Amino acid sequence: MNSMSKKEYKHFERSITLHIKHADFELVGQKYRGRDLYEYLFIKGSKPIHTATGKTSNLYEIISEDKGPDEALKIIGDTFTEDDINILLRGGFHDDNKTPEGVLELIQHILLAGEVLHPGGDVIEPQSFKDYPEKIQAYADQLINDDSIDILESITRVIGEAHYGDEKAVKLLLLSIGTLFLRDTPPVHQALRGSTGSGKTDLVLKTVLAVPERYVHILRSASPKYLFYASETGILREDYNIFVFDDIELNDEIIAISKTITDNILPEKEHHTVKDQEALKLEIPGEGLAIFTRARDIHDNELNDRLLYNNPVEDEDHSRFVKEKIKEEAISGSVMDDKRIMEAYEVIRAVYERLIEGDVRVYNPYLHLLDLRGYSNRDIKHIVGLVKAVTWYRQHKRRREGSYVREGGHDIIIGTEDDLRDALELWMSIDTLQRYKLDRKQEKFLKSLPEYSDELYKQHTNSIFWDDPELPTYSGLAERLGLSKSTIYRWVNGRHEKDRDIEGLKDKGNKGLVIIKPLEPENPKSPSLIYRKPGIVGKHLQLKNGGEASESGFTLFPSVDMDLGTAENARIWKKTIFHSMVLGVSQIQSNIQDNLIQEWLDNNTNPMETHEDVVEFIVDVRAFIHDNLQTPPDVTCNPVYTILGNGKHPLETGGESSNHGDKHDLVLTRAGSIVGNRVNSENKGSEPSDEMTCFPQKNYYSGVGGDLQAEYTDAMARGDDSMIGELEARIPPDTPENLEERRVTLKKKLKDKSISAGEKMELLKELGGVLSTLMRKPVDNERIVEYAKELGEVRREIEDMQGG
């Protein structure tokens, strides 16, 4: 029974050598490229039972060489260990003979009498664009290079051949997938809600089928065994992973793992648990996107808050449409149709390879014009992420701007107003679902309620009959909408389930979404009247466009198609774009005199009337920065170098974390820090650093020199090199001991109840930098986990102080 340890074959690429099915049982074999090693996945009723790894026997030879029953049984017995067989026995991988021998005989029977679903051989799963057949590559490049073709629409149409309807839900899911591959954009995790039979699972599976298979992991069991196995054996990738939780029970362990995956702050994602008195650690590498299909509510508030709610269409017309399409397919469908669809999917997967290899950052200047007051910080990030994802899909049709600092830095894609509006149109299709965490049926019920007014309530209280079906009572609504009274009552009032209180519509939002009034004000036992709270649906945002409301419901101010309204509005927009290009305004102003910036903006005559004008202005801004910036010697740690040279938002300038680069990029500091720009005594000239952390060995946010910041800023502004040198000499080295001392000092200061909110914010931001730097030091893993958790708490506290 030859086998190899999991660590020895980690990260090998696999090829399918066998897929065979008998009755309810399936056996899938895979070979590791370059090694005579195999793994075998056992499936019962579409659910994985066990994966036997590191085997040296190719069971496909039993079929290809027409082995006899006795010889086949011997090969099987030599291939699998006693532990393998016992796991299969406990998992139900047996027929009537519930013994180890019975398991071996079942495997023998599957191999000798089963239906071969895969012909065997050595078909390698593509690992990059060049691994696809030349014909598929040509089709993919044709799609990408044809200016008349919208890639997002093309992918949606292909999926529509396999999943009928739900175009907007499919596009929203595609946009979430796009955020995974975007630099400097947190992934937008999704929950596909919908009642049983609504098609949510089919929608998700047919959508992720368009993504290269190596990135996708589908979980159908509440046991996390697959994830632990996938982590140990290298199935989880170091770059990107998509996790589909397909309507599985969200037990405590799955919720904990889900929260680890969806935490966009943690630099290293680990989940610790104990099983059979053994401590286990699940390491989740790379960037991760979580997708949940759920018929029921997600009861963990923290996890629920991180997810974007999506929902298939649920109405009679859509149901009839889908059934009619299925009937037509059954009548006229053919093997050729399936082959055509699968080939189209393969082309789309090749297109994804092209999109992913671009490694781009998207900048959409029109995002500055959005008025998102009333939205949570989380939803604002979701909206921005979706807008950028639209541009990501259209990257080959959008303007690319290269770097003035680094050769070949063509990775900044400028988004358009169309990209923005297309994303907002999709957002508005789930706006109510997302803002209030509803499903489609609850949303439909909410919209069917009359909006409350004193006049309407007075009119209803004058009704003679309690059972009038036109009254918005539980009985009247149930009769009119075809729902049960108990369902409506549960939706409105919530319920208690599994030691959890599930809030109802009367409690959702700040003060509830519905208003409940007695039919007879003086009689508390009279039927309740249920109204929709005013302003809940469709009126929370307006587009300021000549005073007329837009159907999109979003505010664009000033509107680009109004020629920006006034010269003053155009000037404000220019200034905003300028600052976003340099990110850290204080860094620039310490190197470019403030009056130069203002003079340049005042003299810029760009009318900003067309997208070409906007692009030209962005190009001019970048040229101005390049021409006027006095680049310090330690260029690689200058935030301006980082944004222009690498297209990354450095965290010390307040940008989003880029978890696609070095794992230590996750740092938390404030915009305006300039101390780190010129204090790296260990950097050699302007040689690029492999670790683009923008945290030199000695700086303000590394901690121990923090109290010198005001003096240092003043010296930098005066250009007093003598004072700068003196102050730099006083900054102690960033040793773990000094950093830990500073961490303790900062935490003590934060406990002082007398400090102002502004002082607290500064201390929190400095603490974030200290923790980030500590995580890059040679400290033990327990310390790193402690620092990472504390960093997450600091980040969340800062977000709370900034308004949610």
Swiss-Prot record:
Keywords: Plasmid
Superkingdom, natural source: Archaea
Stored SUPFAM superfamilies: P-loop containing nucleoside triphosphate hydrolases
InterPro entries for this protein: Cro/C1-type_HTH (IPR001387), P-loop_NTPase (IPR027417)
Name of the featured protein: Uncharacterized protein MTBMA_p00010
Organism: Methanothermobacter marburgensis (strain ATCC BAA-927 / DSM 2133 / JCM 14651 / NBRC 100331 / OCM 82 / Marburg) (Methanobacterium thermoautotrophicum)
